[in-house]
């Protein structure tokens, strides 16, 4: 999968599926400095992905500050050819100072054994 470099950040697209409903995010940050994957709550509601009564809620912290998120298993996360099932994601408001549809973190990249080729700007299988 091609990686787009914009404003000195790496961007990809991602698709998530929950109970047969699928949504695609076009502006997803590829972030090896993020331990987890996070998607915006207002978009996840489009596929009825909301917190369960016992979904863990906690604060994550990044460059933009702290943000409350909930964690829940999603049926499928896909980034290009990389696909993982029954994967734990984080969902939060994601109100940042720049347009962003989500973050693919190190947990996903390690789980699918992805390699980032910065010379060719590609996400590839190892």
Summary of predicted features, one role per range:
Residues 1-126:
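Pepsin/retropepsin-fold aspartyl endopeptidases
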């Amino acid at each position: 999968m091609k990686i787009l470099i914009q404003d000195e950040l790496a961007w990809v697209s991602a698709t998530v599926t929950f109970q047969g409903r699928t949504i695609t995010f076009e502006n997803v940050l590829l972030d090896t400095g993020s331990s987890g994957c996070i998607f915006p709550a207002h978009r996840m509601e489009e596929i009825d992905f909301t917190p369960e009564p016992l979904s863990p809620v906690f604060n994550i912290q990044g460059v933009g500050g702290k943000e409350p998120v909930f964690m829940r298993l999603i049926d499928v996360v896909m980034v290009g050819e990389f696909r993982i099932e029954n994967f734990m994601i984080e969902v939060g408001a994601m109100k940042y100072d720049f347009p962003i549809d989500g973050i693919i973190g190190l947990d996903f990249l390690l789980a699918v054994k992805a390699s980032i080729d910065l010379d060719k700007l590609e996400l590839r299988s190892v």
